[in-house]
Amino acid sequence: MSKKTGTKKKQTKHKEKQQGFNDLLIPMLLILCIMPFIVRLALYSCGYAKYPWYSDEDVIMDLYSYYRCYFFEVVAIFTAAVLAFRSGLFPENRKKMKIFIPLAVYAGMILLSTLLSVNMGASFTGNFYQFQGVLVLLGYLVFCLYAYQVMEQEKDYKTIWYGIVAVFIVMAVLGIFQIAKKDLLDFAWMQRLVMSKEQFAEYGGTLETIFSGNNVFLSLYNPNYAGVFLTMFAPVFAVMCSSEKEKKKKIFYGILCAGCLILIWFTYSRSTFFALLVALVVGSILSKEKIGKLMKYILPGILILAVVFVGIDKINDFHYLSRWKEDTPKTKLERMITSKDGVELCYDGKEYLITLEDKKAKIYDKKGRETDIKKVEYSAKMAIAEYDEEKYIDVYLCNQTFTFGKNSKGYYYRTENGKETQLTDIPKVDAGGKEYLGSGRIYIWSRTLPILKKYIVAGSGPDTFAEVFPQNDYVGKAIYANNPARVIEKPHNDYLMQWVQNGFLALVAMIAFYVLLLKKCGTFYYKRELSDIKTRLGLGCYLGCICYMAGSLFNDSTLYTTPVFWIFAGIALASAYEVEK
């Protein structure tokens, strides 16, 4: 048999296989439809006990990330092997990959940052609720390339569409329970499913979500993550509904879209509406219809939705709308550091020095005059107390207790975990006292920006943000995070996280791919006739990617949302490539 004949037979078998269910889609379906529901209790050590800002007890309970991470890594490794095998077996079916060059650079910088990581173990395996180690980050890219390469036939797009519908319906059921304040994890029978017998005997009935009320977080740990997840699905449903000709299907898709928007509302995540607005603008520009004609439908639709959602929020005591009003921290504390001479305090523009002399706490003004604390006027409650048996001072500020001690080297801060450390001036960008905005995001960004210059070439390593962020900013965290002991494990901005953990060059490479994705698909879908499922699903996935990229200004990359983004990106590119070919 000649080589040419053998190749033709391979092609024939390959085409026959594609006419039925394409089993190459199984890895994508596992990630889209199965992984979001992996919930299992795990106990692990984060390794932070060595730091003064963390407790000596560093064993953490995790329900949502630990096993999900390993599931994703196993599937990603298998997917990479299948992709390599397929490319070797059917080289003639391999699509052009020039657009993926920036991702190759991005992958290289991730590997370099891992090798130079401040915590190589965490960068390899993942850590501290995130679990996005090097294998996970590279796995994202594998799935993007895989989706791009294997999505070929009309049936492939239908299969993925059915998977999207199925996962959303299950998520919607979870969301309905949560809106009714009856999360399934509150039930003992469900807790038995997500724990071992030994764990249930110890922890059963004690699991509590960290979100009160009826916040929708689905099976994704955090309402913000649920919001990002749902904003990627909403454009898909909207495109499928608006382009559907069959009346029954159109109604069904409309119900899916409306349900998705309702669930988004109950996440109470403000960034989701920014992301949806960006996608709406882009979708309107790409539409075949003239903008003026579209506005006749869009504006009334927005008005109706606004009335409906405000009505729902009124019934819910304006839970959502109240979040748009940021509460300014009621404190005038500006600075507090420890020194050899005492605790230096700047409050309401006035400087003071607190000392411990003969087991008695004393306070002096800027000129060195002793002042009675009761005679000092403060807008917030402040008091000083000393222990008779221990050389400690308690300072009550910002509704927090700061404990200070004195030894031969001077004064030190005693953390809530009983560790001794210093309060120092923290490098920061002046935010004009607006650090509280965005649920404290401005505070985190103002402390993150000064450390960016350290990570131009390589970053600190995957999953190490918590270890390089100035966690010793106890005063700042007391004011803007309500707890000086809180660990800031992410910047709430994926672009900042990429820069810190993977380096500036990695961020540039990632953004370069985003630009190519926007340009390639934007050009292709501009005024495109939505006559087949692959074009419709491709456009929906493209707009979903835009939602993710816009939302990433206020949210981080996570195992709960990012796999969907990269698969959607591959689908959008595959759809554009399919018809173009």
At which residue positions do the language-model features occur?
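Alpha-helical transmembrane segments of multi-pass inner-membrane proteins
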Residues: 2-9, 15-16, 20-41, 70-86, ...
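Interfacial/capping segments of alpha-helical transmembrane domains
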Residues: 43-55, 184-196, 459, 469
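Juxtamembrane membrane-water interface segments that cap and precede transmembrane helices
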Residues: 46-65, 122-123, 201-219, 443, ...
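Membrane-helix interface linkers and caps
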Residues: 87-96
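Non-cytosolic membrane-interface motifs at loop->transmembrane helix junctions
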Residues: 123-134
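TM-adjacent membrane-interface loops and short helices in multi-pass inner/ER membrane proteins
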Residues: 222, 401, 407-488, 495, ...
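Membrane-interface capping segments at transmembrane-helix boundaries
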Residues: 577-581
